[in-house]
C-alpha cells in the first residue's frame, strides 16, 4: 500500500505503536497450496479458465445487465432465440468463445450456452457482446435484468462457412451445456405444455 506500494506489515506494526491503533494481520488465503488473490483470478479469467477462477471466488464470474434487442438472427434464422447483453467497456471478460452458463432471472435459475465475442459469422457492425441461449426457456425478457454466470469454457469463437454450419454447431453447443448442467448441477429439462403459445420473443 502507499506510495509505489512500499508499505508492508512491518511498517504498519511500527505505525500502530506510534499512532496507537490496533493492528490485526489477516493471513493470506490459500487453496490447495496456492495463494488466492485478485491478480491470480484475473489471470485465470484472461486465459479462459473460468472453472479454476470460479473456485477461488465466492460467486462464479458473471455478466449482469439488461437484455437488449439483437439482429433477430437467433430466432428467425438459427431457430435458437438468444438473450443479448452489452457489457460495460471496462468489464473484465474472458477470451472470446463459447461457455456453459447459468442464468438468474428474478428468483429463477436456468442453464444455457453463452457466446462472448463479436459473432464473426454474421455480417455487419462488430461490437463486444454476450449472447446466451437459455435451455428450456420461453419468456420475453427484453429490457429485463439478468445475471449470466460463466461456468465452463466450451470452445473458441469461430467463423463458419454458412449459417447452416453455425446453426448445427450452436445446437451441438446447447446439447453439451445440457449434459454439463445435468452432470454437475442435476439439471433436468422443464416440460412445457402449449409450448408454441408461450414461445419466447428473444432474438
What are the functions of these language-model segments?
Residues 5-12:
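Charged helix-capping and loop-helix junction motifs
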Amino acid at each position: 500500500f502507499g506510495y509505489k506500494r512500499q508499505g508492508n506489515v512491518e511498517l504498519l506494526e511500527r505505525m500502530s505503536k506510534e499512532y496507537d491503533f490496533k493492528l490485526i494481520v489477516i493471513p493470506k488465503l490459500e487453496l490447495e497450496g496456492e495463494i488466492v488473490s485478485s491478480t491470480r483470478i484475473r489471470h485465470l479469467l484472461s486465459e479462459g479458465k473460468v472453472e479454476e477462477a470460479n473456485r477461488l471466488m465466492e460467486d462464479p464470474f458473471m455478466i449482469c445487465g439488461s437484455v437488449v434487442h439483437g439482429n433477430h438472427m437467433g430466432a428467425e434464422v438459427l431457430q435458437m432465440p438468444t438473450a443479448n447483453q452489452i457489457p460495460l467497456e471496462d468489464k473484465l471478460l474472458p477470451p472470446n468463445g463459447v461457455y456453459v452458463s447459468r442464468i438468474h432471472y428474478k428468483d429463477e435459475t436456468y442453464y444455457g450456452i453463452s457466446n462472448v465475442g463479436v459473432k464473426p459469422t454474421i455480417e455487419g457492425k462488430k461490437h463486444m457482446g454476450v449472447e446466451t441461449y437459455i435451455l428450456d426457456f420461453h419468456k420475453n425478457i427484453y429490457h429485463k435484468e439478468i445475471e449470466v454466470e460463466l461456468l465452463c469454457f466450451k470452445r473458441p469463437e469461430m467463423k463458419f462457412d454458412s449459417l447452416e454450419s453455425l446453426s448445427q454447431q450452436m445446437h451441438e453447443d446447447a446439447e453439451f451445456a445440457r449434459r454439463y448442467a445435468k452432470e454437475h448441477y442435476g439439471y433436468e429439462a422443464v416440460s412445457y405444455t402449449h409450448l408454441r403459445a408461450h414461445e419466447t420473443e428473444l432474438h
